Amino acid sequence: MAFSSSIFSVTQFSSSLASRPSSAISRQTRFPAQIASPDLSPALFDDRRKFVGGVMSLLTKSIKNRVYASINSIDSAATPSYPKSEDDDDVVPMPMVMIDQDADPEATIVQLSFGNRLGALIDTMRALKDLGLDVIKGTVSTEGSIKQTKFSITKRDTGRKVEDPDLLEQIRLTIINNLLKYHPECSEQLAMGETFGIKAPEKKIDVDIATHIHVKEDGPKRSLLVIETADRPGLVVEMIKVMADVNIDVESAEIDTEGLVAKDKFHVSYQGQALNRSLSQVLVNCLRYFLRRPETDIDSY
């Protein structure tokens, strides 16, 4: 009789647990002394086999009830829950477009990423073909939560990589335009979003703070010009015009766009030679003035 009443009390505990899982597991966890231990005296059983069987049966039911309580309890200490942020899925990743001229001697590498939201990019490849380019290879890789797509492209008429800086800028703007078209949520993270997107960027980059210009040695025949500044439509073409005004030749360019920031590299020369120190300083000053020109023009009046 004592054993039967013990089984009954556990069953009742399970029943009350189903109706009130939170309070039941709280009582069990916080106040274990309040739960009476069942009477398992061997004298209540006819033989040793019945005793062992009774204990195992009770133990099994107890374990099942505890597992059931852990699954259904909302404040169980054994199974803590970690609330997921409501806007985890609403965070818009940073769009990135990189045009690499050094990775492959035969082709221009275009790499773009937008978290894990990019698809097959069929329309982007079609748009590149409209520029007279051939996509000879495409690869997709994943690093953590970021999906990166790479295209190897060449000029259709020559079969060689793209060297013309104007065409490189067209490639960049074409890709960004497709991003804005098929992923309009990225508009507030791109400079072109202010003109062509559904929502202009909320955060404005201070041009004075963001602008860094350096000229480095890159052999006797050319120099490496590195520019980091706030991005804007047509930036590369305009910078090349500034260089042409001081008779600097642009041999090739690498163009990277990381959200609102442009990070560009140009291989430049003057009359077939690398830039000396004084000419490098003239170039840096001209570019710095051009990049700050909107504010300078206003202040000059």
UniProtKB/Swiss-Prot annotation:
InterPro entries: ACR1-12, ACT-like_dom_sf, ACT_dom. Residues 109-189, 224-294 form the ACT domain. May be involved in feedback regulation of amino acid metabolism. CDD domains: ACT_UUR-ACR-like. The keyword NAD does not apply. Its main location: plastid. The lineage of its organism: Eukaryota, Viridiplantae, Streptophyta, Embryophyta, Tracheophyta. SUPFAM superfamilies: ACT-like. Signal peptide: none annotated. PANTHER family: ACT DOMAIN-CONTAINING PROTEIN ACR12, ACT DOMAIN-CONTAINING PROTEIN ACR4-RELATED. Residues 1-57 form a transit peptide. GO terms for cellular component: chloroplast; chloroplast stroma; chloroplast thylakoid membrane; plasma membrane. It is found in: Plastid, Chloroplast. This is ACT domain-containing protein ACR12. Keywords: Chloroplast, Plastid, Repeat, Transit peptide.
